[in-house]
Amino acid sequence: MFHGTITKELTSHEEWSHYNENIVEDQKDFVFVKYNGLHLKSMENLQSCISLRVCIFSNNFVTDIQPLQGCKKLIKLDLHGNQIKTLPDRTFWNGLKNLKLLYLHDNGFAKLKNICVLSGCVNLVGLTMFDCPVSLKKGYRHVLVNSIWPLKALDHHVISDEEIIQNWHLPERFKTFSQSLFFNICPAPIKGTTYEDEIKNIKHIISRINEILAHNSPVLIIQRWIRGFIVRKHLSPYFTRKRHHDRMIRVLETKLICIGRNNEDKFLEDIFLIKPESNIKGKVAHWKQMRYSPDDFKYSTEYRKHISCLSYELKTKDIAGNSKQPRHHIQKGQNEMKSDSEDEEVDTKFRISAMKIPLCPSRSLKYRAMLKEIKWDYFPEYLQPLPATRQKPQVKRETHEELKERRNFLASQRAGMDLHLFNDIDKYYSEQRQQEEEARKFAATAAAQVAQERARLNTSENLRKKISMARKLMQKDNETIQKGLRHIWKERLNYLEKVRERKSMFLAEKKLNAADQSLVLSLNNERSILLRGIIQVDKLKRDLSEMKAKHFDVIEKREKRKYKQNLLTEMKKLRAEEIHKRHCEERFVIDTLIFQKGCERLEEAKAKVEFINTYYTSKSHKKYHNKTMLNHI
């Protein structure tokens, strides 16, 4: 719109009134305005921008910001690089309740009293006023920090607790102008930024300020500790409540097998119910999961009497490999189960799908290496029991051809001889053979029962010896562990003493370094102030020289322009005179030509008259001829 300016003639004209009303209606919806470096002198065009949130009006010639009073939704206001010397009153700043970032550096503020009106901004987080005359005053930062309460960052440093709390001396990390509190609150502007980019930049700046305060403000750190303590104290009944560790019981259908482990007179058992008849290769049975608490272990001893125990090292066979039957001990309560399964054939191709044994406690892991060396397991290996009943003798059946031959022999020889005597002899020998077989089997079963009893006694004795040996090993291990712990504690105490000595030396060096650093910082600050003044003086000199050069250039241009105008006027005069001369010469030539033609005609007429006078004699004819000649002339 006319490069951002509208003249009074256009605004007052009747044809432009409707256009101006549309402009005002559009300005009410403006959210983001950026006039950077346009050499503008007033902000009157922003009076109707009610919805304005981000206003960048930097590097101009603005002196009054009162037109922004209607922009009550401002979040960011950038007015640096202008010629503002006074700020509006407190009512102006009370209306800007959403203002969080205010950039006023590089302006002409000179009085602290005028700046204190910024305390009306209830949500102001960041403020910049460096490169202003007021920033060179002694109590500039102290007055601003303690008058604008919500302020968190001033110029290039976040506000420390040392500036707020009087006579509080803090370490170097938390002091004013420390390196940890440095933050570039006004980054370099980027061309082509949109409203979304500016909002993201505002959020980033505020979050960065809060992060620096959270890590470098002792008050906030202590508050965080106290809040954590209160929350933990409030939630401690929920964390200290004892929970029973659930155990998993996996259930399949028919037979009970217990996998148990003895660890310092404590039994932890996982109970499985399996199908011994299942002949499945490489398939996992369907388990039903049940939970039980440690209170259920009270009945484990009674329940253990009625189930069979397996070894800890049950090895399942591979899918295509040979299977090994686990060795287990059959107790008295299993006679009924044993009698039911006597006549069934044992299938050697079954696979037990077992759950993993729960992890051993940390104390039992100490004996793992020793147990590997002596190749001893926690659980005994029991012998495979022999069946209590004898097996049926195998009956040899005759083939069809043998039966046919015997029938033919009996049919042919029956009529010739009596076979009753031979039948009695065969019956006697068969009964005698059967009695011998039964006596041999009875002796074998008696020997097997004796061997089984001897094996049971041997296993119980081996178990007792292994338990006593394990207890002795545990006592020795406890003694060695206690010695090792004492040695470790001594080493730790020596290490802590060395660390304390190093810490004291480090703190002393740190104090010296802090003093040196503070001296260097003070010198750098003084040097930076001096350099800034020198740069400003050089800048003023440069500006004056540039202004003088521009002034001389303007004067030269004016003289050249006047000289050109004089030349043009003289050239016009000369050209007019030349044109007049040419016109006169042409007029003279034309007049001479006309006169010559008239003379020629007169002489021709005279010649004709003489001719007539000489050749025509009659007077009438002469008169008529004279009239015609005169008319012709």
From Swiss-Prot:
Residues 132-179 form the LRRCT domain. Residues 556-616 form a coiled coil. It comes from Rattus norvegicus. PANTHER family: LEUCINE-RICH REPEAT AND IQ DOMAIN-CONTAINING PROTEIN 3 (PTHR46723:SF1). Signal peptide: none annotated. The keyword Chaperone does not apply. It comes from the Eukaryota. LRR repeats lie at residues 51-72, 73-94, 98-119. This is Leucine-rich repeat and IQ domain-containing protein 3. Residues 215-244 form the IQ domain. Residues 322-343 are annotated as: Disordered. Keywords: Coiled coil, Leucine-rich repeat, Repeat. It holds the Pfam family LRR_4. InterPro entries: Leu-rich_rpt, Leu-rich_rpt_4, Leu-rich_rpt_typical-subtyp, LRR-IQ_domain_protein, LRR_dom_sf.
